[in-house]
């Protein structure tokens, strides 16, 4: 645990030191769980968006984009269930005065049980080697069965209690499991209470006539209320999807773990509209498609797993999370939900407008069912950043910190580095910079030794460092250094554009999906 905490502290400090993420309003002592993306952070964030957008829109003929407003009519949130049901069950520790989500405390307890089960599996793998039959072991080993049955019983009881709003039983479960404050070890808990997560605001010049509004807690509803506009103007038949990237806001009472859980965050969502009765088929398809999208990033298949929901949201008939192994354990990265026709039918009732689709193949009108994929952009940023940040000891005993991001996502694609500013090297380097800047995001740097400049570029994830020296002036070749291997090669200046493009083009990621 201490090692994981050290890794996480390194992630947070590196993100600030190298211009990726700053605490918001820092000169005024900041705001809890709100962050600003710096010069390198915004480039990485935009590249992640571009990868998602291309995979959703560019590679799928039947998915189109949308950018809906943050402010929407307040009745939308009544229809969606957010006014009445968008709550978190919170519990306070009387000794530490810290507040926690009761459901997360219980889920973390179950995650430890799963860790114990995995340790039993790993021990058996080492013992039996290539002859190990994992499926048989998992289905017969008493310890694994005990750990997993206990998890199932606990999560099922919690889901039932939350569905029935039986908060007393949620507290009783915490006490029966002897769950303690993870920071202090105290088991002295208050009662569990529900807190609504929506931010309220006002629309109007005069306070007495102002309309109550909400900052949207999710981007999905903007898609639902526009679905018929998009369908008619795009002339798409079902199944088709609408994708959107946008800000959402939640008054998280318990906001921790850096950018993993924030009050202002960004979502990348796609709502896929399908004929009733086909939703579970498309749900399974999108589960696999979304996992493949993540795996193409090269962060390791062992760092992902599906978590199928025992407790379903009020709108869903099936739901699963793609979880990622963060420094603080496996946590949700993306959700895939079969939302049925809950949202569109609710908006029909509350608006009085028909939202039915006429299906020419079935020769009937119906309210479509919806399959949703929703990934937290900030969480994906954290997954990439924490996994790719490495400290390496080199053959000569020296050390370096490198951010080994997928080249297509790297904030800066190449650094242009004149060995010295004098003797025409600076001017030649500027010429290369000005020639390539139309195709790639570059950085020009001529201060400090070349070794120090290499280290700075390693730390922000730049795939290539291009050094201009005395020989460049006569033979028009440069030294190009590769980030991950640190190998150097001499190449013609005329080849640079193609070399960089071959490495950083989004085609390299998209073709792996």
Predicted regions and their residues:
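NTP/phosphate- and nucleic-acid-binding module
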Residues: 1-513
């Amino acid at each position: 645990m201490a090692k994981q905490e050290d890794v996480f502290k390194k992630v947070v400090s590196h993100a600030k030191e190298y211009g990726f993420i700053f605490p918001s309003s820092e000169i005024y002592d900041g705001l809890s769980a709100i962050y600003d993306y710096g010069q390198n952070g915004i480039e990485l964030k935009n590249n992640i968006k571009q990868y998602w957008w291309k995979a959703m829109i560019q590679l799928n003929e039947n998915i189109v984009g949308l950018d809906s407003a943050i402010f929407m009519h307040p009745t939308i949130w009544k229809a969606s269930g957010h006014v009445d049901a968008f709550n978190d069950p919170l519990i306070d520790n009387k000794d530490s005065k810290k507040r926690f989500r009761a459901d997360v405390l219980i889920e973390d307890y179950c995650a430890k049980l799963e860790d114990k089960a995995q340790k039993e599996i790993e021990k058996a793998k080492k013992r039996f080697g290539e002859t190990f039959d994992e499926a048989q072991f998992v289905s017969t080993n008493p310890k694994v069965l005990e750990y997993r049955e206990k998890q199932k019983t606990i999560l099922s009881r919690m889901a039932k209690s939350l569905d029935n709003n039986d908060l007393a039983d949620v507290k009783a479960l915490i006490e029966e499991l002897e769950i303690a404050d993870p920071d202090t070890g105290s088991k002295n808990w208050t009662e569990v209470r529900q807190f609504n997560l929506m931010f309220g605001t006002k629309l109007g010049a005069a306070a007495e006539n102002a309309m109550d509004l909400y900052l949207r807690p999710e981007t999905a509803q903007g898609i639902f209320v526009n679905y018929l506009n998009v369908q008619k103007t795009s002339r798409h038949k079902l199944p088709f999807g609408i994708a959107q990237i946008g800000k959402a806001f939640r008054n998280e009472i318990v906001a921790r773990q850096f950018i993993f859980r924030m009050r202002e965050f960004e979502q990348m969502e796609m709502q896929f509209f399908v004929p009733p009765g086909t939703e579970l088929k498309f749900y399974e398809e999108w589960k696999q498609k979304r996992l493949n999208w993540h795996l193409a990033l090269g962060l390791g298949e062992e760092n992902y797993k599906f978590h199928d929901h025992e407790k379903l949201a009020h709108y869903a008939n099936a739901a699963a999370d793609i979880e990622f192994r963060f420094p603080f354990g496996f946590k949700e990265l993306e959700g895939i939900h079969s939302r049925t026709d809950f949202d569109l039918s609710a908006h029909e009732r509350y608006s009085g407008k028909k939202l039915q689709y006429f299906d020419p193949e079935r020769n009937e009108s119906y309210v479509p069912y919806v399959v949703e994929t929703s990934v937290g952009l900030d969480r994906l940023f954290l997954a990439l950043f924490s996994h790719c940040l490495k400290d390496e000891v080199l053959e000569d005993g020296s050390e370096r910190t490198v951010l080994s991001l997928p080249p297509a996502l790297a904030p800066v694609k190449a650094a242009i580095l004149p060995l010295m500013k004098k003797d025409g090297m600076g001017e030649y380097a500027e010429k290369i910079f000005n020639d390539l800047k139309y195709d790639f995001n570059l950085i020009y740097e001529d201060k400090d030794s070349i070794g120090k400049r290499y280290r700075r570029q390693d730390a922000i994830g730049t795939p290539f460092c291009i050094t201009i020296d005395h020989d460049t002036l006569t033979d028009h070749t440069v030294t190009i250094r590769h980030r991950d291997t640190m190998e150097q090669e001499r190449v013609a200046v005329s080849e640079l554009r193609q070399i960089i493009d071959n490495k950083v083009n989004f085609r390299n990621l998209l073709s792996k999906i």
